[in-house]
Amino acid sequence: MARVTPIVRYRNIGISAHIDAGKTTTTERILFYTGVNHKIGEVHTGSATMDWMEQEQERGITITSAATTCFWSGMANQFDSHRINIIDTPGHVDFTIEVERSMRILDGVVMVYCAVGGVQPQSETVWRQANKYKVPRIAFINKMDRVGADYLRVVEQLKTRLFANPVPIQLAVGSEDKFTGIIDLIKMKAIHWNELDQGVTFSYSEIPDNLTDLSGIWRKHLIESAVEVSEELMDKYLSNSDQLTEQEIKQALRQRVLSNEIVLVTCGSAFKNKGVQAMLDAVVEYLPSPSDVTSITGVLKDGSTRVNRHANDHEPFSALAFKIATDPFVGNLTFFRVYSGVVSSGDSVLNPIKEKRERFGRIVQMHANKREEIKSVHAGDIAAAIGLKDVDTGDTLCAPSSPIILERMEFPEPVISVMVEAKTKSDQEKMGFALNRLAQEDPSFRVWIDKDSGQTIIAGMGELHLEILVERMRREFNVEANVGKPQVAYRETIRTSVKQEGKFIRQSGGRGQFGHVWLRIEPMPAREEGYKFLNEIVGGAVPKEYIPAVDKGVREQISNGILAGYPIVDVCVTIFDGSYHEVDSSEIAFKIAGSIAFKEGFMKAHPVLLEPIMNVEIETPEDYMGDVIADLNRRRGIISGLENSTISGKIICAQVPLSEMFGYATGLRSQTQGRASYSMEFLKYNEVPNSIAQIIINSRQIKQ
């Protein structure tokens, strides 16, 4: 089936922001103005199209990345129809994984900020994720109608807190209840939207007298940012600034956005139906099409030969599976982004990571949780497949005749765990299936059975994350479960290097067992580098066929923990010597020898416990600041900054161990009479102080 929309008129964008910036409301307005919805959905009434899960409608937050497609021809129908594939992503830090995997497959992002709250901690997390994947972006400063709205203050925060290079292409006409429209700094006209038809029509007018000077200043800033794109344009501007055409300015700005040199800033009030329409125009004019993005690079099966795929229908098919979702009617839905080529329903493709062929049963275009079946998808498309049996998030799908492995996604390790227990025997049978399904959908969610207690443990990115997954288990799989208290995901590591011998010799008549190794056990130079095993055997002291067995013995100790039963991280283990017996040596003997050497060496290398440290940001009236800081100090917090709040009060930034943050919301509420709020996100792992570590180790040993 031939392509309907040329690839240059595609825009694959994300709508991303911190919680409560009005992101889903913005997306709902996009769906209304592009004709997908004929009625505006609202978050506060639970009718938002993109928040389709029951929990999302009840809580008023976005949990999963919903996908939809719409078409836009411009506010004044000035463009050919552009196809916009939108991923609406969560703002809550517990669902950062959804943002991460969306950024991996998008070409551009609209960052939504609240004109009152400004740049929040979660804004910084999302910004870092966009930086990681070099995604071009524009900013939409929303909620200009709210009390305390200040457009230019948020523009300044983009510079100071995100180290961005913001270039406003609009100014606000008024703010709070006097917000009436925007000033287009390229056309140098004011735009007002018709409230009678919910902003479908608009009119231009002259810039109000009180904003003429300010508009001139920011227009100059915009032009100077644009002409930096080339010496030729700079010379033209310097010789006569009035010579620059609107088209030249827009092309120059677009070029700098695509190079991630500037961030264009727009504004409005999605709730009041103002500004979203002009922001959509900016998406078309300034964000990249798939063909603007450099080719995607992958490797062949050998892992070293690099190959490129271009956004072209004539190249071999390649795609990345970025999300697995469970649909009650069709089973697994595999969301994928096509980077090159074409695939049709019924086609066979290769999963080169698992070396398995998969068949596309049906291909569907998703609109939130509604499906529209389509025959084929082309380079640049985002769609979902039904019928893929063994595909995980981050797997590559490609033409069997031209294998390629695209760069895999990285997922954060969980920082919090709880015990779950089925309420009845019938629930017990269903619970394993439900948890495995949820873990398949969400790579930041882990499930395992505790080897000592036999209990089922689930782990995730925060209390809300686990709470919602348990709730989904109840609603979607009809499983009732009791949930234990949250537990911190501690880790174990070492401070110093040691050399340790490990011997396993057994003679009991007949063939014996013999394994003998020397290991060097060293701490990694940086935190969160995991585990590395190196082989420095020379002269065949240990035959090479036994080396993997030694690694396996070490890995078992690493996953089980030694000090207190927590996983071991940030260690490098090198086998550098040993011996073997021609008859009695075996894989199992060397596995046990490796395990013995590592366990004994680990305890000599000054082992320590690590705990997750959270970045905490509290907004509180100034009257309560002393109490809040004193409480943070009691919780082993380190104050990292104080800022003036956007309204009246202070923002306190602190680094606090996760173990001290359980129940913090209740404590903060009582301290400040409900007038303070806080947010937190995982920052790093740090050593647990000796006195506290000993209590944790002793309690674990008693349990074991």
Swiss-Prot record:
One of its GO terms (cellular component) is cytoplasm. It comes from Blochmanniella pennsylvanica (strain BPEN). Belongs to the TRAFAC class translation factor GTPase superfamily. Classic translation factor GTPase family. EF-G/EF-2 subfamily. One of its GO terms (molecular function) is GTPase activity. The keyword ATP-binding does not apply. SMART domains: EFG_C (SM00838), EFG_IV (SM00889). Catalyzes the GTP-dependent ribosomal translocation step during translation elongation. During this step, the ribosome changes from the pre-translocational (PRE) to the post-translocational (POST) state as the newly formed A-site-bound peptidyl-tRNA and P-site-bound deacylated tRNA move to the P and E sites, respectively. Catalyzes the coordinated movement of the two tRNA molecules, the mRNA and conformational changes in the ribosome. Keywords: Cytoplasm, Elongation factor, GTP-binding, Nucleotide-binding, Protein biosynthesis. One of its GO terms (biological process) is ribosome disassembly. SUPFAM superfamilies: EF-G C-terminal domain-like, P-loop containing nucleoside triphosphate hydrolases, Ribosomal protein S5 domain 2-like, Translation proteins. The gene is fusA. This is Elongation factor G. It holds the Pfam family GTP_EFTU_D2. It is found in: Cytoplasm.
